A protein has these predicted regions:
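Catalytic-core regions of core metabolic enzymes
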Residues: 1-689, 697
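Short beta-strand element of the conserved SAM-dependent methyltransferase core
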Residues: 522, 573, 692, 783, ...
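Long, contiguous binding/interaction regions
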Residues: 697-886
Length: 886
């Protein structure tokens, strides 16, 4: 997630065009023409031995002759010269380079050359980039684009050209327009980090085909989406499309899971993409999901209603006060309701009056105005009057307004006026609703990600025992474990299983059944038959010895006939579970080539297709994330909300999914887990049949996960000066209530020292940002006192690293009544050790000159203390490398 060199790429002060030309069909000509036409106000240096000047600009014969080192170079020559030219640019000290084309055979050499010279690369096979706020058009596109607040990042030149052409027709602006190409060096995660902090960018749109590093993408996207809406269109949903794009894109539901986990929103096609661009460019952030619809015809309003219903949207309910004001203002034949049909004879004045009344109310969160071509209210005239009314209304900034001027030719000018006025406008009622629901879903995603997770009850795990069992099985050469072998592993994580016995033949099966009691179930054991149902390999409700013997022999006979070469490892014998009113579910964990382990929930079946029959999540899961997965399964009808007799216990199933997640996170030896069926009966969840694929694992356990899990290994018990022992551990999302209680025990003076302002209270969003952190980017250690089953926070220290992992900003806060126990120092020592081990170079912070305790502590810990009395601050800097040496 490095930001090194991005400033030189996205805000260059000078640009060299290598291979500049005066021949109109050459890349060097097109690049020079676009750079000069774009209004770039820095030096543009054409490099070519063939021309003395290019488009009136003095040319230089080679890179060595350049009068100074350019920030950015663009290679427009034959691809065979790429490596030699890049080497020359590196020796010159150039910081960034755009490579327009390069064969795959060059990629490794180009990457190595760039690394050697500390140079950043965009591309190869990149269309280039446009930065309208800098007057920069370093691309092949002749299309000029306006300045705007939307940034677009694309992995496809074709899609980039399409969006540029579409945006030009609608006079839509961008802050940045970046075509990544093959992402040999600079990738989407680094650009997300940059754009998240860019003041000219208020929203981001991504077109993606593949990812080089899923974890970096999820981390960067999650961080950026907390402040700016990000929409994604992802191609390659089908295997055929993946082959066409020549990508290993992974399971499409895994993309959905990652996008949702990061707080982004996915659009499904180019039609939605265009609507999304319009929405992100002009729409205000939503306050809620209640929609009010105004129309001058029933049919367009009905189309909007149908679309809203299909998206599970929510209509606003008007208050009686608002209804009465509308009755007084509108003709008597207008029925006051939502949608509000002003009828086809409605004038522009009726629209404006209605808008004024509605904007004064607080009955809705977004207002959709539909206009069908009408002689009573001409499209352009009504648009102009509506724009003026919105511009001068004192409450217009509190409402998200969407306009839908139907028709093509007659409404074209009206839509142009809306775009100029910064109001989102759409061609159809359905497209308008789709755009609205995009923002509703984005808001819901962000709200869900900030909810405080519930604490699971009776959550147990014995990682050491599970590891031992897995290692023993691997040492014995096992690659797959059956139900009876998996049982102790699941039980180590608190999951219920049915007691299971192995019978080698029908006689032994009868003997076991007699011992455990009837009724029983028999299940075939064969590594060669993937689905037992193919040979009726599961027999249930066997109530006598004769039934058991006959069933066992029948299973063996069917295998010999249908699968004569199959190996038979006997039978599993289980007591029959109570299936009365129970529901059968399936939980599967599989490894995705892009996102690593995935947790899938569905109802199963012989020909199980997770893309169609399951909902998917990325581990690790907490109770909130698990509950969202269950609810998503119910809403999408992948699982039923109830069995014949009782509703599904959502909380209980969520807890089981958390247990599965913990098992997968802790045990990298697990390649695949299949619990099928999982019997849900009231609050009881029992794994009846389980298979587990395993393999030796070496390396970093966390690296295989798309989201970094809670690092248990950093927990530490510490003894304070008064002899009390407390636990130092990483902060958790579940800590929000305890953190709020901790802050209430800190004096106003100490809070002022910490936050440099008077803090009356912290909102839920503030506390969520403090507790729901990305351990890849931020670390917060809390000192907790454990009393019985409760925890009490005594102190907090925190470090937030920059994307380059060089500097981190730190802070520390201790409960005011616990000073003098050495707690602050021990927390700081813990943080210093962590940041140093994490590869950071410097730890920085600021405090106030009169915070003598913090200043003294910083000096003792080796910080450089810079007292700046004029600024009223004290700068604190610790060189972590020097401290380690000392």
């Amino acid at each position: 997630m490095s930001q090194r060199g991005l400033e030189a790429l996205l805000r260059p002060k000078s640009i060299a065009v290598i291979g500049a030309s005066m021949k109109p069909n050459r890349a060097g000509y097109l690049m020079m023409r676009n750079l000069l036409a774009g209004g770039f106000n820095g030096p543009v240096l054409p490099v070519t031995p063939a021309w003395k000047a290019v488009l009136g600009v003095l040319a230089w014969p080679d890179i060595a002759s350049l009068p100074f080192t350019p920030d950015l170079a663009v290679l427009c020559t034959n691809a065979s010269r790429n490596l030699a030219l890049l080497e020359e640019l590196g020796e010159k000290g150039c910081k960034t380079c755009i490579i327009l084309s390069a064969p795959a055979s060059q990629h490794e050499d180009l990457r190595a050359c760039a690394l050697r010279h500390n140079m950043r690369l965009l591309g190869p096979n990149s269309l280039g980039l446009l930065a309208p706020w800098q007057g920069l058009n370093a691309s092949f596109s002749p299309v000029p684009i306006k300045r705007g607040k939307l940034a677009f990042i694309s992995q496809s030149a074709a899609v980039s050209n399409t969006i540029l052409d579409w945006a030009q027709q609608r006079e839509m602006g961008f802050s940045y327009f970046i075509a990544l190409g093959d992402s040999l060096d600079i990738d989407v995660d680094e650009l997300l980090d940059y754009l998240a902090r860019d003041s000219k960018t208020s929203a981001i749109l991504l077109y993606l085909e593949q990812l080089s590093d899923a974890r970096r993408f999820v981390s960067a996207a999650r961080s950026a989406s907390r402040n700016k809406p990000i929409l994604v269109i992802k191609s390659g949903r089908s295997p055929a499309a993946q082959r066409l794009l020549n990508t290993t894109a992974g399971m499409d539901p895994a993309w959905d899971a990652a996008i949702q986990r990061a707080g982004l929103l996915r659009v499904q096609d180019t039609h939605e993409l265009f609507s999304a661009v319009e929405t992100l460019s002009h729409m205000r952030p939503l306050r809620g999901d209640r929609l009010m619809i105004i129309s001058n015809g029933a049919a367009p309003a009905a189309l909007a209603l149908d679309a809203l219903w299909s998206h599970n949207g929510k209509l606003a309910t008007l208050s009686e006060e608002t209804c009465q004001k509308l009755r007084d203002a509108l003709p008597g034949h207008v029925a006051i309701s939502n949608p509000l049909d002003l009828r086809d004879d409605a004038s522009s004045e009726h629209y404006v009056k209605t808008l004024d009344i509605l904007l004064h109310s607080q009955d809705f969160d977004a207002l959709m105005v539909i206009h069908s071509p009408s002689a009573a209210a001409p499209a352009t005239e009504s648009a102009q009057e509506l724009i003026e009314a919105v511009k001068h209304h004192p409450r217009s900034k509190y409402v998200s307004l969407l306009t839908n001027w139907c028709g093509e030719h007659s409404s074209q000018e009206a839509r142009r006026l809306f775009s100029e006025a910064g109001l989102p406008t759409y061609r159809t009622p359905e497209g308008t609703i789709t755009a609205f629901m995009h923002m509703v879903e984005y808001r819901r995603n962000q709200k869900q990600l900030r909810e405080t997770p519930a604490l699971p009850s009776n959550l147990t795990s014995n990682t050491a025992e599970a590891h031992l069992l897995l290692q023993q099985a691997i040492a014995e050469g096992a690659t797959s474990l059956d139900t009876h072998e998996v049982q102790p592993i699941l039980q180590a994580y608190g999951m219920n299983t049915l007691p299971t016995w192995i019978a080698s033949d029908s006689t032994e099966a009868v003997h076991i059944a007699e011992q455990i009691g009837y009724p029983v179930a028999l299940k075939l054991r064969s590594p060669d038959i993937p689905h037992k149902s193919e040979v009726q390999g599961v027999m249930l409700y066997l109530r006598t010895a004769n039934e058991v013997q006959q069933a066992a022999n029948a299973i063996f006979d069917r295998v010999k006939m249908a699968w004569p070469q199959a190996r038979i490892h006997g039978l599993l014998v289980q007591s029959m579970a109570n299936r009365a009113g129970a529901q059968e579910l399936r939980v599967v964990v599989e490894h995705d080539p892009v996102f690593g382990p995935l947790i899938m929930l569905g109802e199963g079946g012989v020909e199980w297709r997770p893309e169609d029959q399951a909902v998917v999540a990325l581990p690790p899961l907490n109770m909130n994330l698990a509950r969202y997965l269950v609810i998503q399964g119910i809403k999408s009808k992948k699982i039923r909300a109830r069995s014949a007799l009782r509703p599904l216990d959502v909380a209980g199933l969520s807890q089981l999914l958390v247990q599965v997640s913990n098992l997968i996170v802790d045990c990298p030896e697990i390649q695949r887990l299949d619990i099928h069926p999982l019997l849900a009966s009231g609050s009881e969840f029992t794994a009846l049949d389980v298979t587990l694929d395993i393999a030796p694992f070496e390396g970093d356990n966390e690296s295989r996960l798309a989201v970094r899990p809670y690092p248990h290994q950093l927990e530490e018990w510490v003894e304070l000066k008064n002899g009390e022992r407390c636990l130092f551990r990483q902060i958790l999302p579940e800590d929000e209530p305890q953190l709020q209680q901790f802050i209430s025990r800190v004096t106003k003076e100490d809070l002022y020292y910490r936050y440099f302002s008077e803090i009356n209270e912290f909102t839920h969003e503030d506390l969520a940002n403090m507790t729901q952190i990305d351990y890849d980017r931020e670390m917060a250690f809390v000192a907790v006192r454990r009393i019985d089953q409760t925890e009490e926070i005594l102190g907090v220290t925190r470090a937030i690293s920059d994307p380059d992992n060089i500097d981190a900003e730190f802070a520390v806060l201790v409960r005011s009544d616990l000073k003098g126990l050495g707690l602050g120092r021990r927390l700081m020592e813990k943080l210093i050790t962590y940041t140093r081990d994490h590869g950071l170079q410097r730890l920085n912070g600021i405090t106030m000159p009169n915070n003598r305790g913090m200043v003294a502590l910083a000096r003792k810990l080796g910080f450089n203390v810079d007292i700046q009395l004029e600024e009223g601050i004290v700068g604190l800097t610790l060189n972590l490398a020097q401290r380690e040496e000392s």
